[in-house]
From Swiss-Prot:
Name of protein: Uncharacterized metal-dependent hydrolase HI_0454
Organism listed in the record: Haemophilus influenzae (strain ATCC 51907 / DSM 11121 / KW20 / Rd)
Repeat recorded as keyword: no
Superkingdom assignment: Bacteria
Keywords: Hydrolase, Metal-binding
SUPFAM superfamilies attached to this UniProt entry: Metallo-dependent hydrolases
Coiled-coil region(s): none
Protein family (similarity comment): Belongs to the metallo-dependent hydrolases superfamily. TatD-type hydrolase family.
EC number assigned by the record: 3.1.-.-
Amino-acid positions noted as binding a divalent metal cation 1 in the UniProt annotation, renumbered to this chain: H7, H9, E95, D206
Binding, a divalent metal cation 2: E95, H131, H156
InterPro entries, sorted: DNase_TatD-rel_CS, Metal_Hydrolase, TatD-like, TatD/YcfH-like
Co-factor remark: Binds 2 divalent metal cations per subunit.
Obligatory cofactor(s): a divalent metal cation
Amino acid sequence: MFIVDSHCHLDALDYENLHKNISDVVEKAHARDVKHLLAIGVTLSRFEQAYDSLREFNNVSLACGVHPLDFEEEPYDAERLLRLAQDPKVIAIGEIGLDYYYSADNKAAQQAVFGSQIDIANQLDKPVIIHTRSAGDDTIAMLRQHRAEKCGGVIHCFTETMEFXKKALDLGFYISCSGIVTFKNAEAIREVIRYVPMERLLVETDSPYLAPVPYRGKENQPAYTREVCEYVATLKGVSAEAFAQITTQNFERLFKIRVE
């Protein structure tokens, strides 16, 4: 079985208590058939800091972008993002988007940074990885306004409504399932995942956050993508092996790579 963790924050895991190093994390994942990881950036400085420790892994791809909750950490620099994202190891622009749940007093600034990053993704022909929270209408509006259907992308860690999902699918976007789908109170999300065609689904951990059942409350890690894969496979009425193959093919199609 070959599973891809399509979204993890490898620089944020607990290397003091739980893991020796990134190689340890990658090996634990591989032992559970999670054989390719997409490591996500949230600021450009943090991306640069993590780059040297990640570039040596053939089974780890990178995404570079500025997260809506982190964009005020340093001045947004579109030229710097463009330069960093041209690296062939970088297969996506992300994680980018809008978050009004934690920060609603800077909507205009969030939107400006988000729009700029979609434009860069289109310029480079690399997909976008979208974070959206309490901002569904504006997220869809901006994806349309900036022609995000050209570069394509994924709604990561999906927690939105059926209406949002249909609009995202209409734009050609993929939907990614995280550990949240296993939570007891996530029936509305499960309903959407049942609706979404299997050819448009990805699986992820969003490590170190949102560990799936039975690890809920503990630090998440890429190895636990297997739990997400098995759970969603059952939801879709297929074997875990078949679902792993489908979601791996989806990952390759969206990000225009062959994984190893």
